[in-house]
């Protein structure tokens, strides 16, 4: 599925739609956020997480993971950009994060290959500050069920 995102409001709307649809499942959902620096991966993640009532959402670039928990959601936001070896994810206990019934947003998933779960949904962002494109792949049975909600 390919979408043009003409402005920040459209990115926010897309992220919130995914957040709403992901919570309608009883399973953990893994979303890969793919793209070059500055294409909006972290912005998408922030809008997604804020949908659940979290006001302060920071980038996990230096911490590798930020966790957000409340009565509405259990979210783990990973940023693998600074990994020098996927094994580093094992040191922070990634398997424990992935076992929980939670939502996983993973930026730069290609750098964590072999240590991270397979994607249910992959969102590849491209473009610049003026307009972006999102190429969305629904890669699992769960992902395809979320697609039905997303496209309405």
Language-model segments: residues:
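Short beta-strand-centered segment that lines the nucleotide-binding/catalytic pocket of NTP-utilizing
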Residues: 54-69
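N-terminal pre-Walker A segment at the start of P-loop NTPase domains
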Residues: 1-19
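Phosphate-binding P-loop
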Residues: 21-28
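Conserved lysine of the Walker
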Residues: 41
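Hydrophobic anchor at the beta1->P-loop junction of P-loop NTPases
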Residues: 31-33
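Short phosphate-coordinating micro-motif centered on Lys-Gly-acidic
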Residues: 84-87, 95-152
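The conserved Walker
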Residues: 37
